[in-house]
Swiss-Prot record:
Presence of keyword Transcription regulation: no
Lineage: Bacteria, Pseudomonadati, Thermodesulfobacteriota, Desulfuromonadia, Desulfuromonadales
Cellular compartments per GO CC: cytosol
InterPro entries: Glyco_trans_1, GS/SS, Starch_synth_cat_dom
Native organism: Syntrophotalea carbinolica (strain DSM 2380 / NBRC 103641 / GraBd1) (Pelobacter carbinolicus)
Pathway: Glycan biosynthesis; glycogen biosynthesis
Recorded GO MF terms: alpha-1,4-glucan glucosyltransferase (ADP-glucose donor) activity; alpha-1,4-glucan glucosyltransferase (UDP-glucose donor) activity
Bilayer-spanning residue ranges: none
PANTHER family documented for this protein: ALPHA AMYLASE DOMAIN-CONTAINING PROTEIN (PTHR45825:SF11), GRANULE-BOUND STARCH SYNTHASE 1, CHLOROPLASTIC/AMYLOPLASTIC (PTHR45825)
UniProt similarity note: Belongs to the glycosyltransferase 1 family. Bacterial/plant glycogen synthase subfamily.
EC number: 2.4.1.21
Protein name: Glycogen synthase
A Pfam family annotated for this UniProt entry: Glycos_transf_1
Length: 484
């Protein structure tokens, strides 16, 4: 199949979250399955700084944005054997952040990603690549299905092209003032309750949900959760109405990129058959972060975005009780400034028992996965989650709230003794989190039982292959629905 994946961030070029990992890994697996898959993303300042070897493909056709005409340029690079197109438009994308500063989103994000949607549709005929499916991701590409139904409706180039919108996180909805319709020069007929209108605002994500041929999200449990009022972020009605076209496909991880046997960031390699190197990584992590070097102390870690979704309120409320249990606690992450400030203060109070590192550091993240005994994800909601999959691969036992993709990948001995690979809790409370941790700590004190759990986690197959095969199945179904 001819597949174009459009995303606002793609690892390793630009990343703020899990979307980038998916957008970088899935196309490579689709390519290995024999499909002609290509990627398109904006050319951000951070991408320029990498001095990639890019080929200039020419000027973009003029893109009309309301009363203004915007121009841009098109570049081509590659990710392994997958072509990657970069849309250059310096007024929109030559900035320090992808979406904003640590305090605020950029005020012109509607224009920026409106341009990205229009620009990618203008670019493909110029490139001469006619996709059977446009795989769109999150609100940043949400306008594309609406544009295809209006501005491009009569264009023969896209006559047979189906669309799929993947929801990586329903909490990010691309909400903008109603006047955005005029600012971007969108067809006013789109601004209805059945279209882009959402409580007197415009929602880019809603456009993707309403107008795409198919919707997917990143785990089966999250797919069910978002059709409920409690978890639907106001879109449960739309999603329930489109349930016949809504599917959950679990994300994978790139098992070549995440492999403790050959990860260059680790002090010592190790494997499911030889766990000895894991202890050396724990020792190095303790030393590097200024923690007491003790092989026996349970080392509990988090690599996370510092946002309310991630259950950091539970960690903050349980901080002293966590430390009273004798664990060492390591947190690496960046995000909301108030969380960063509060956790920096907490981390400084017990420097030999806790370490909080703000920002993102890939080498340190890898050492954390390898050196930790337990990996904590107490998320209020978690569409899929990649952290628990990497933790399992690296033999770090996940302690997670049973929601979304966490419920689909982490199995508690109380529920599934033969498949157990971690510990789960359901209630959103510090006491429920601590109870799950206490069960983990009890098993940690039984070395043979603990090793068995660690090994079972490391043996799990969370590679992209099965997910990619499922996506191909759904791409074909989307094309059928488009032609029906």
């Amino acid at each position: 199949m001819n597949i174009l994946l459009a995303a606002s961030e793609v690892a390793p070029f630009a990343k703020t979250g899990g979307l980038a990992d998916v957008a970088g890994a899935l196309p490579q697996e689709l390519h290995r399955l024999g499909h002609d898959v290509r990627i398109i993303m904006p050319l951000y300042r951070s991408v320029r700084k990498q001095h990639l070897s890019l080929q200039h493909l020419g000027e973009l056709p003029a893109v009309k944005m309301g009363d203004a005409i915007r121009t841009g340029r098109l570049w081509q690079g590659s990710l392994q054997d997958v072509p990657v197109y970069f849309l250059e438009q310096d007024d929109y994308f030559d900035r320090d952040g992808l979406y904003g500063t640590s305090q605020n989103d950029y005020p012109d994000n509607a224009e920026r990603f409106g341009f990205f949607g229009r620009g990618l549709l203008a670019a493909l005929p110029q490139i001469g690549f006619k996709p059977e499916i446009l795989h769109l991701n999150d609100w940043q590409t949400g306008l594309v299905p609406a544009l295809l139904r209006t501005e491009w409706a009569e264009d023969p180039f896209y006559a047979g092209t189906a669309t799929m919108t993947t929801i990586h996180n329903l909490g990010y909805q691309g909400l903008f003032p109603a006047e955005t319709v005029a600012t971007l020069g969108l067809d006013p007929a789109l601004y209805t309750m059945e279209g882009l209108e959402y409580y007197d605002q415009v929602s880019f994500l809603k456009s993707g949900l309403v107008y795409a041929d198919m919707i997917t999200t990143v785990s089966e449990t999250y797919c069910a959760e978002i059709q409920t009022p409690q978890m639907g972020h106001g879109f449960d009605g739309i999603l329930h109405a489109r349930a016949a076209r809504l599917f959950g496909v679990l994300n994978g991880i790139d098992d070549k990129l995440w492999n403790p046997q050959c990860d260059p960031a680790l002090t010592a390699p190790y494997s499911v058959d030889d766990l000895e190197g894991k202890a050396a990584n724990k020792r190095q992590l303790q030393k590097q972060l200024g923690l007491s070097c003790d092989a026996d102390v349970p080392l509990l870690t988090m690599v996370t975005r510092l946002a309310s979704q991630k259950g950091l309120d539970l960690v903050e409320q349980a901080w002293e009780q966590l430390l009273q249990r004798g664990v060492q606690l390591v947190i690496l992450g960046s995000g909301d400034q108030d969380f960063m400030d509060r956790f920096a203060q907490l981390g400084a109070q017990h420097p030999t028992q806790t370490a909080v590192r703000l920002g993102f550091d890939d080498r340190l993240a890898r050492l954390i996965y390898a050196g930790s005994d337990m990996f904590l994800m107490p998320s209020h909601y978690e569409p899929c989650g990649l952290g628990q999959l990497i933790a399992l691969r690296y033999g770090s036992v996940p302690v997670v709230r049973k929601t979304g993709g966490l419920a689909d990948t982490v199995f508690d001995p109380q529920d599934q003794a033969t498949q157990a690979n971690g510990f789960t809790f359901r209630e959103i409370s510090p006491s429920a989190m601590l109870a799950a941790l206490d069960r983990a700590l009890a098993l940690y004190r039984q070395p043979e039982g603990w090793k068995q759990l660690v090994r079972r986690g490391m043996q799990g197959d969370f590679s992209w292959r099965q997910s990619a095969l499922r996506y191909v199945e759904l791409y074909r179904k989307a094309v059928e629905l488009h032609h029906a």
